[in-house]
């Protein structure tokens, strides 16, 4: 997979499009099949989540496929003017096409939080530096700990949360409306901040701001020589992370626990491709380790036979990721 700069795009390159919109969709279940049909007809891969509160997800296809999907969404009465952010690659970073029905399009787990009723103040990327340079502003990264580990804004507070569900409790324990008069928040594409700023407003915080379009929009619009971003930005696809040019970054992913890892970390004794890394070595049972090793063997055999991403190799990787996700959940429950 090789990153592509926007100026060098051709019709054969892949667009990676993150999109979301909070909107009342009382009959969202009826959208699933026609939306999936449009994605499949245009060879769009990735996952879209739909719920009564809106739509969210990241998909990829060649330019024509993405344009056709966005055109279809625009024609739906409630789904016009969707927030989108694009990056580019020479390969599709997804293996499958999915539309999932959900209770929430981003899971916070707090009843009654509605960004359509109350939300923080949006701050444009070109105005963000000035805001977070204000000494009276507390800057909070609302993402998960493994995302923050590889990159964040200068002087940002890390809540050390493993999932977004943990954020409300962290905020209750660490933030006070009487002390923290100005709160600025950010996330990857903006959607988590729609919920987190709405929650903060509900908790009595007055001046609550969030980065419009998230980190991805900031990296797109703010020049590198003016940036206050440090590191790379984690993304939830096969690229793992993107750099300031929105090109694939320097991180790989442990397929046992899905954590980002560097080339140097692959040299550690705990790392075995597809089986374990220093993040998960103590959380993987012998039985899981054996399964992961067998799955990795299948992947390598498929690669040796020259089978493509939609063949046995992809199926092996998908099964491996499913097992890794279950193993990660079990490890968290046991703590």
From Swiss-Prot:
One Pfam family named in its UniProt record: Rhodanese
Matches recorded under InterPro entries: Rhodanese-like_dom (IPR001763), Rhodanese-like_dom_sf (IPR036873), TrhO (IPR020936), TRHO_N (IPR040503)
Alphabetical list of SMART domains matching this protein: RHOD
Reactions mediated catalytically: uridine(34) in tRNA + AH2 + O2 = 5-hydroxyuridine(34) in tRNA + A + H2O
Rhodanese domain location: 133-227
EC number per UniProt: 1.14.-.-
Active site per the UniProt annotation: 187 (cysteine persulfide intermediate)
BP GO annotations: tRNA modification
Single GO term (MF): oxidoreductase activity, acting on paired donors, with incorporation or reduction of molecular oxygen
PROSITE patterns the record matches: RHODANESE_3
Functional summary from the UniProt entry: Catalyzes oxygen-dependent 5-hydroxyuridine (ho5U) modification at position 34 in tRNAs.
Identification of the protein by name: tRNA uridine(34) hydroxylase
Organism: Pseudoalteromonas translucida (strain TAC 125)
